A protein has these predicted regions:
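A short, structured active-site edge motif that brings together acidic residues
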Residues: 52-55, 137-155
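Ser/Thr-centric signal marking residues that sit
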Residues: 13-16, 147, 207
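Substrate-recognition/cap helix-loop segment adjacent to the acidic, metal-dependent catalytic center
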Residues: 116-145
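Short alpha-helix plus adjacent loop in nuclease-associated cores
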Residues: 145-172
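Active-site catalytic microenvironments for nucleophilic, acid-base chemistry
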Residues: 125-132, 153, 157, 187-188, ...
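Acidic, Mg2+-coordinating catalytic module of metal-dependent nucleases/exonucleases
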Residues: 109-116, 120-121, 164-229
Length: 229
């Protein structure tokens, strides 16, 4: 570990609905079954990766798992668990591993793309499994950051990005550029054929590139999910 490097964690989750009949996608109705992260620096260099499958949900909540948005990937998960690419373990042990990485690399900031969703679903899962004995997944000391929020500030208004979205019809109903991780990565990488995998660690690998691109703009950004009081 290099004390001159400011290490950050980029994290992503995949979820299944608690109540499949509930309309809309809201963090309070989601359980985390896949959690992956990478320890990175602002230049996108990767120092450690983790890829976990939450056994408490993946094994014990089969009805919910059968309603997961990417349930067709379940056989892939089993193959990767057997090969050792993913670790099947309890949610408590996933959190323990995160705390270990935070301590080892002296991490003070954790990022996700649309962190509001990941933050909410991790807390929902934590509260469900501990019967609200423990209510928050991330330590209180961690600064919670959002690359979607950053992208709105330093990418969305770039003429090059606006033109890119217009040319490829990546626009919202209001005619503004969309800022999904998949579209942003297509813009950054120049790979129009890229399709997001929608598994935890794989998505982290594109989200850390979004983080890198935002930092490369050398502009003042409000990175934190929630504004300070």
């Amino acid at each position: 570990m290099n004390n001159k490097i400011k290490y950050r964690i980029v994290l992503d989750t995949e979820t299944c609905p608690i109540d499949k009949d509930f309309e809309g996608v809201t963090p309070s109705n989601m359980w985390v079954y896949d959690c992956g992260w990478a320890v990175v620096d602002r230049n996108g260099n990767v120092y450690k990766t983790r890829s976990f499958v939450n056994a408490d949900i993946f094994l014990n909540e089969k009805i919910a798992m059968n309603s997961a948005y990417y349930q067709n990937k379940i056989p892939k998960y089993w193959d990767e668990i057997k090969s050792g690419e993913r670790i099947l373990t309890s949610f408590a042990k996933i959190r323990k591993a995160l705390l270990e990485d935070i301590a080892k690399f002296k991490v003070t900031e954790i990022y996700a793309h649309n962190m509001r969703f990941d933050y909410g679903t991790l807390n929902t899962t934590q509260r469900w499994l501990t019967k609200s004995k423990y209510r928050y997944f991330f330590p209180k000391s961690i600064i919670i950051c959002d690359t979607l929020k950053m992208s709105r500030q330093v990418i969305a208004n770039k003429k090059k990005y606006i033109d890119f979205c217009k040319e490829n019809n990546y626009l919202t109903a209001r005619g503004t550029p969309r800022l999904t991780a998949e579209i942003l990565y297509r813009f950054i990488s120049g790979n129009q054929d890229f399709t997001e995998e929608h598994t935890g660690l794989a998505d982290v690998m594109i989200e850390k590139e979004i983080l890198k691109y935002c930092f490369k703009q050398h502009k003042k950004m409000n990175r934190e999910l929630y504004a300070k009081a």
